[in-house]
Amino acid sequence: MIKPILVFGYGNLSRGDDALGPLLLDYIEKHCDLSKIELLTDFQLQIEHALDLEHRTLVLIVDASVACINRCDFSPLTAARDKSYTTHAMSPAAVLAVYVSIKKQAPPPCFLMSIKAESMELGAGLSSAAENNLQQACLFVKQLLQQPTLNHWLQQTSY
C-alpha cells in the first residue's frame, strides 16, 4: 500500500553539505510517526522519480542549496519544463512536469524545503553552519508532518 505522504531527500553524503537532504530524512525516521509517510532518498532527482508522486496527497522534496535566502526555504512547487528536463539530474519542477506529461493530470501538491549549504566538496563533512540549518529544518519539518494537510502546509510557506 502506498503511503499518502512522500518525503524525498536527495543529495550525496560524501559531499559535505550536500548531505542535508538525506540527513533530514534520518531525523524524520527517528522522530516522526511514519505510518502515513514514505521516505525516499537518492543522489539526485531523475525522470523515474515522477512515478513516485503517484497516489500521494502531499509531497515534500528536501535538498541542500547554496542559493537559499534564509537558513531554510519552504515553498510550493509547480511543474515546469526547464533545461534539466533532458539531463540525468533534474530539478524538482522538471520532475513534476514529467509527471504531468506521462499521467496526463496535475501532480499532487508538492513542496520544496531547501536547506542553506556552504560547501559541497567531495570528502568533506557537514559545515557547522549547515548543521545549525539542519537542526532548524528538522524542527520545522517535524511540525509540518504533525499536521499533514495542504492548507497547513500552504500557511507555512512564508517561513
Annotate the PLM regions.
Residues 1-117, 124-136, 142-159:
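N-terminal catalytic or cofactor-binding beta/alpha core of small enzyme domains
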